[in-house]
């Protein structure tokens, strides 16, 4: 089956990239950054990302609608001080506009409605694989193509705690994170665990705990030429 006109195909709406430099040992850095995508009709897009780095993990941790924009926050963790720099590429996909006009060399229409269901000029969301599991893994795809991953389910575990610091009469809050992330080296997808620790001082006492979700699922998307 090549085309099913019962479904609305997704096509590329916007894209962008950001270079991330591995900080020096002891250098202060912010472990997250954001990018913004203009929305169509107030509906958030489907986001695929490609992190080109052997050892730097990047993954979407938060997204929010702000006006007519979809603002996405990406968490990243370098291997300090000798890790590779990283580049994050992001791709935003929306349903194809229904039209009877096609401009590509190959155009398929529903013969009853005259609506275009495929146009070779459009950059469709091309899903080539689904990677699911609960532990680190590696997958290889044909060379000469460019791939990105789209998270459908994220595996994570976060444990929080509060400790009273008597010498400063304050509480220290901490959180230990483990998140499964996807990173690319050429056409090889590496699913790896990323561990991070957050801490702050002066937060009032609260109840610590553990929150987790077991199991991940990523779509592998061919974005060659996009």
Predicted region positions:
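Extended intrinsically disordered, low-complexity coil regions enriched in Ser, Thr, Gly, Ala
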Residues: 34-70, 100-101, 156-182
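Charged, low-complexity intrinsically disordered segments and flexible loops
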Residues: 173-201, 208
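Extracellular receptor-binding modules and their adjoining Ser/Thr/Gly/Asp/Asn-rich linkers
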Residues: 1-36, 77-163, 167-168, 195-226
């Amino acid at each position: 089956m090549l085309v099913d006109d019962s479904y609305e195909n997704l096509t590329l709406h916007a894209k962008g990239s950001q270079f991330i430099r591995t900080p020096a040992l002891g250098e202060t850095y912010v472990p997250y950054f954001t990018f913004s995508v203009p929305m169509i009709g107030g509906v958030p897009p489907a986001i695929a990302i490609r992190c080109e780095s052997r050892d730097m993990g990047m993954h979407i941790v938060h997204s929010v609608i702000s006006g007519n924009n979809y603002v996405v926050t990406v968490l990243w963790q370098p291997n300090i001080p000798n890790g590779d720099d990283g580049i994050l590429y992001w791709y935003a996909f929306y349903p194809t506009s229904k039209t009877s006009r096609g401009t590509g060399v190959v155009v398929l229409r529903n013969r009853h409605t005259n609506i275009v269901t495929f146009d070779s000029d459009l950059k469709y969301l091309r899903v080539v694989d689904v990677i699911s599991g609960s532990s680190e893994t590696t997958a290889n795809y044909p060379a000469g193509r460019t791939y990105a991953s789209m998270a459908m389910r994220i595996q994570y575990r976060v444990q929080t705690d509060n400790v009273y610091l008597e010498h400063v009469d304050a509480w220290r809050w901490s959180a230990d994170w483990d998140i499964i992330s996807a990173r690319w080296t050429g056409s090889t997808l590496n699913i790896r665990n990323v561990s991070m620790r957050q801490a702050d001082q002066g937060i009032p006492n609260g109840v610590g705990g553990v929150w987790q979700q077991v199991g991940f699922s990523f779509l592998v998307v061919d974005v060659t030429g996009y």
